[in-house]
Amino acid sequence: MSLVIPEKFQHILRVLNTNIDGRRKIAFAITAIKGVGRRYAHVVLRKADIDLNKRAGELTEDEVERVVTIMQNPRQYKIPDWFLNRQKDIKDGKYSQVLANGLDNKLREDLERLKKIRAHRGLRHFWGLRVRGQHTKTTGRRGRTVGVSKKK
């Protein structure tokens, strides 16, 4: 970034209901969106033909629109299925990249489905216990500590 700020520089961009810092490089700035990691950001920017060294605030409206459309429709732009974060969806069997608020909704739906079918993982979530097989005898205790009274 040059020392002189361009005329059309935006310090904060609003993309997919997320505030993006315009001073950061675009590849790292769009990782602020839920469901977009560094690898996915790089692939999207390559498909959109945007310089990776550009700052997010230097993007034109057209470039921002291109990035958003590629992020929302990755399969149309030949991003492989194994790269996406929602593979073989339980309802429709489709592959997709879930972003921002949609990611929260999908996660909540998945947990509700697990609880409804009384799966072990769903029950552990319901009880507020560890889900992934960790030991819980000594760690992960909550609530007040109970002291030991000394015998006289």
Swiss-Prot record:
Loss of function: phenotype: Embryos have a reduced forebrain, kinked tail and inflated hindbrain ventricle.
Record protein name field: Small ribosomal subunit protein uS13
SUPFAM superfamilies assigned to the protein according to its UniProt record, in alphabetical order: S13-like H2TH domain
Entry similarity comment: Belongs to the universal ribosomal protein uS13 family.
Domain of life: Eukaryota
Cellular component per GO, a single term: cytosol
Subcellular location: Cytoplasm
Functional note: Component of the small ribosomal subunit. The ribosome is a large ribonucleoprotein complex responsible for the synthesis of proteins in the cell. Plays an essential role in early embryonic development.
InterPro entries attached to this UniProt entry: Rbsml_uS13_C, Ribosomal_uS13, Ribosomal_uS13-like_H2TH, Ribosomal_uS13_CS
Main location: cytoplasm
GO biological process, any: regulation of cell cycle
PROSITE patterns for the chain: RIBOSOMAL_S13_1 (PS00646), RIBOSOMAL_S13_2 (PS50159)
Organism field: Danio rerio (Zebrafish)
GO terms of molecular function: rRNA binding; structural constituent of ribosome
Quaternary data: Component of the small ribosomal subunit.
Alphabetized UniProt keyword annotations: Cytoplasm, Developmental protein, Ribonucleoprotein, Ribosomal protein, RNA-binding, rRNA-binding
